[in-house]
């Protein structure tokens, strides 16, 4: 089987811009609150620390959402070649309403635990689960999750008739 790219999942420019705007606005509002309120030194230090963390996450999201996730015949990969999950390690794809998943995304369950990783707005890896989505376009994420479910069904040799995707 060749390692050809089936589909790519990129950040939606509108969703990315809105998410960055909200995070940066929150960070600057916290800094403004620190400057204008009459609070104790420890409260101000706490507000500055939270503002710095929010602005750092906004910068991490800005850098991370310039990339894309690829679904290849061998698995899920980030644009720089980082392996998210191999097809042989994936047990199922969850996209339901009550699934613990990113906004407009899906969750991939793995056979074994993986290293933790997180790119805000694109994906997170924790334990034996990978959440993909956030600032991505819902239609692209749905297509990728459906295609991944078909690849898993083909690997297991099961019929897709009656399968709930």
Model-derived regions, located:
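A structural detector for beta-sheet-dominated domains
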Residues: 10, 72, 79, 111, ...
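Hydrophobic alpha-helical transmembrane segments of multipass integral membrane proteins
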Residues: 23-28, 48-55
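Short edge beta-strand segments in beta-sheet-rich domains
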Residues: 66, 103, 125-127
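Hydrophobic alpha-helical transmembrane segments
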Residues: 37-50
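Acidic, Ser/Thr-rich low-complexity segments on the non-lumenal side of membrane proteins
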Residues: 83-115
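Conserved beta-hairpin
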Residues: 50-94
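N-terminal membrane-targeting/pre-transmembrane regions
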Residues: 1-38, 129, 159, 163-165
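A membrane-cytosol interface segment of integral membrane proteins
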Residues: 112-165
């Amino acid at each position: 089987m060749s390692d050809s790219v089936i589909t790519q999942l990129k950040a939606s420019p509108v969703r990315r811009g809105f998410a960055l705007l909200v995070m940066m606005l929150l960070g600057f509002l916290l800094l403004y609150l620190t400057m204008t309120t009459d609070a104790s030194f420890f409260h101000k230090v706490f507000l500055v620390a939270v503002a710095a963390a929010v602005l750092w996450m906004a910068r991490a999201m800005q850098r991370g959402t310039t990339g894309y996730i690829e679904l290849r015949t061998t698995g899920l990969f980030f644009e720089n070649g980082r392996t998210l999950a191999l097809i042989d390690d994936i047990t199922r794809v969850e996209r339901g309403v009550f699934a613990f998943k990113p906004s407009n995304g899906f969750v991939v369950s793995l056979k074994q635990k993986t290293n933790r990783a997180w790119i805000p707005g694109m994906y997170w890896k924790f334990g034996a689960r990978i959440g993909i989505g956030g600032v991505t376009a819902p239609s692209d994420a749905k297509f990728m999750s459906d295609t991944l479910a078909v690849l898993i069904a083909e690997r297991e040799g099961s019929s897709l008739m009656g399968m709930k995707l």
